[in-house]
Amino acid sequence: MKAVQRIFQTGRFSVAAGPSVRFQAGFLAANRQVRFSSNHGVSLEEINTKYNDFFSNVQDQFELQRGLNNCFAYDIVPSSDVIEQALRAARRVNDFPTAVRIFEGIKVKLPTKEQYQAYVKELKPVCNELGIVLKEDLFK
């Protein structure tokens, strides 16, 4: 036991360690895997069509949040048409917080503030129609 403690204190794993320590270190290294996306051939148009259809048919809060999670999991930012359908779905299921958080997701996905402001400007009429206030406007 003292040998194991000494090894952990020095930060080195060596042959002096017991078999359980070597097994644990090997087990941890073996579980490190790089996982890649399997959607290599999916185009932007296919994603937009898929999520436009999905959000236009959402009927409950769980489906809406699941769809948003899946939509934002891609390496691309959804188009403004998809965001508009998601906002309409959020108001349809009476989920105001999710409607506000959709814009937070867009802000995180976009690399610059100018791009975010372009999304906000394009979706401003929809926000006014649905009564959605952005987080920036709530905390002024």
Swiss-Prot record:
GO terms for biological process: mitochondrial electron transport, cytochrome c to oxygen; proton transmembrane transport. Pathway: Energy metabolism; oxidative phosphorylation. The keyword Iron applies. Keywords: Heme, Iron, Membrane, Metal-binding, Mitochondrion, Mitochondrion inner membrane, Transit peptide. SUPFAM superfamilies: Cytochrome c oxidase subunit E. Component of the cytochrome c oxidase, the last enzyme in the mitochondrial electron transport chain which drives oxidative phosphorylation. The respiratory chain contains 3 multisubunit complexes succinate dehydrogenase (complex II, CII), ubiquinol-cytochrome c oxidoreductase (cytochrome b-c1 complex, complex III, CIII) and cytochrome c oxidase (complex IV, CIV), that cooperate to transfer electrons derived from NADH and succinate to molecular oxygen, creating an electrochemical gradient over the inner membrane that drives transmembrane transport and the ATP synthase. This is Cytochrome c oxidase subunit 6, mitochondrial. It comes from Schizosaccharomyces pombe (strain 972 / ATCC 24843) (Fission yeast).
